[in-house]
Amino acid sequence: MRALLQRVSSASVAVDGNTIGAIDHGLLIFICAMPGDTKDTSARLAAKISRLRVFKDDAGKMNLNLAQTGGAALVVSQFTLAADTSRGNRPGFSGAGKPAEAQALYEQFAQDLRALDIPVQTGQFGADMQVSLCNDGPVTLWLDTADG
């Protein structure tokens, strides 16, 4: 699985002009399932993200994780994280997981975060979504479970 994390002071996602998910302080997580990903992959990624110390402590150092700050996660599916731009000018997306499997893993990932006591809001899988955010820092991280 691939994830692009942004530390935010606020974020929301809308479909057809209606806000379907919103958080204040926390992480906006764009997520993409890749071929070969499993429920175990999802659980490991959720655990890793929940432990990442990317929030400032009283000394201003990135030393706190999401739960320690009382933050939430907004999880948005984004198959374009699987883009292959190595040839031509049009990205290829054949490296993304098949839609039915990807949707199941997207939903599993949100559930895995909830099981770790992280409040979670989500987008709508496969929908044309408008995502708004106020990046805090900015802090943006790329995680790929294929990297270990």
UniProtKB/Swiss-Prot annotation:
It catalyses: glycyl-tRNA(Ala) + H2O = tRNA(Ala) + glycine + H(+); a D-aminoacyl-tRNA + H2O = a tRNA + a D-alpha-amino acid + H(+). Pfam families: Tyr_Deacylase. It is an enzyme of class 3 (hydrolase). GO terms for biological process: D-amino acid catabolic process. One of its GO terms (molecular function) is Ser(Gly)-tRNA(Ala) hydrolase activity. Its EC number is 3.1.1.96. It comes from the Bacteria. Its main location: cytoplasm. Coiled coil: none annotated. Keywords: Cytoplasm, Hydrolase, RNA-binding, tRNA-binding. It is found in: Cytoplasm. A motif (Gly-cisPro motif, important for rejection of L-amino acids) lies at residues 137-138. One of its GO terms (cellular component) is cytoplasm. A Gly-cisPro motif from one monomer fits into the active site of the other monomer to allow specific chiral rejection of L-amino acids. Belongs to the DTD family. PANTHER family: D-AMINOACYL-TRNA DEACYLASE 1, D-TYROSYL-TRNA TYR DEACYLASE. Homodimer. An aminoacyl-tRNA editing enzyme that deacylates mischarged D-aminoacyl-tRNAs. Also deacylates mischarged glycyl-tRNA(Ala), protecting cells against glycine mischarging by AlaRS. Acts via tRNA-based rather than protein-based catalysis; rejects L-amino acids rather than detecting D-amino acids in the active site. By recycling D-aminoacyl-tRNA to D-amino acids and free tRNA molecules, this enzyme counteracts the toxicity associated with the formation of D-aminoacyl-tRNA entities in vivo and helps enforce protein L-homochirality. NCBIfam families: D-aminoacyl-tRNA deacylase (TIGR00256). This is D-aminoacyl-tRNA deacylase.
